Design a protein with these regions (language model features):
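Class I SAM-dependent methyltransferase SAM/SAH-binding core
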Residues: 1-25
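A short acidic, Gly/Pro-enriched loop at the edge of an enzyme's catalytic core
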Residues: 23-35
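Residues lining the SAM
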Residues: 34, 39-40, 62
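A short glycine-rich, Lys/Arg-flanked "PGG" loop and its adjoining helix->strand segment in the class I
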Residues: 44-60
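Conserved class I S-adenosyl-L-methionine
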Residues: 58-89
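Acceptor-substrate binding/catalytic loop of class I
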Residues: 78-92, 110, 131-136
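Conserved Class I S-adenosyl-L-methionine
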Residues: 103-173
Length: 173
């Protein structure tokens, strides 16, 4: 859905939005761009980014970090394996960027708190962010939702940590 939304927003402003094809190949010649940006990519194809950047060109991206809103996932699905909780760690992005021949200029991660003050907000969120609890429906999780409603009513907001990281990389001259 993000490509369609970005296109609808940016095309009227004269900004083309281009998505990689299924094999992550970007439809551009080598050394085409001074800057490549992305926000919340599903996957970062570092070799392709390095290929399309001109020498000295940069890549800037904000990405979802590890275990983002993991508390919410685990509330509905139970404990997740360490391999799942550790996915999308900025150290992995740094290593992959370097392996593609890029220099990492800056890498920083922030952890924020997301508070759900009522169960309706949880339902809305899980319907929009479908990968947090795959296959989520009110019917399937009615019991857990009722328990969560009671928990929020008696103890206050359900809080989940949200992690994001910013990475800036540069193709050497």
């Amino acid at each position: 859905p993000n490509i369609a939304r970005a296109t609808a927003l940016l095309r009227p402003r004269g900004v083309p939005v281009v998505a990689a094809d299924s094999d992550h190949t970007l439809p551009f010649a080598d050394a085409t761009f001074d800057l490549v940006v992305s926000r919340h990519p599903l996957a970062t194809c570092w070799p392709e980014i390095a290929r399309v950047l001109r020498p000295g060109g940069g890549y800037l991206s904000q990405q979802v970090g590890p275990a983002s809103v993991g508390e919410l996932t685990e509330y509905f699905l139970g404990p997740q394996p360490a391999a799942v909780r550790g996915r999308r760690h900025p150290d992995g992005a740094r290593d992959a960027a370097r392996a593609a021949g890029l220099e990492v200029v800056d890498l920083r991660m922030e952890t924020l708190h997301t508070e759900f003050r009522d169960v309706g907000a949880v339902v809305y969120f899980l319907r929009k962010v479908i990968w947090i609890v795959p296959g989520f429906t009110v019917e399937r999780y009615r019991g857990r939702l009722a328990e969560l409603h009671e928990r929020i009513r008696t103890t206050g907001p359900f809080t989940a940590r949200t992690t994001r990281f910013l990475i800036e990389a540069r193709r050497p001259q």
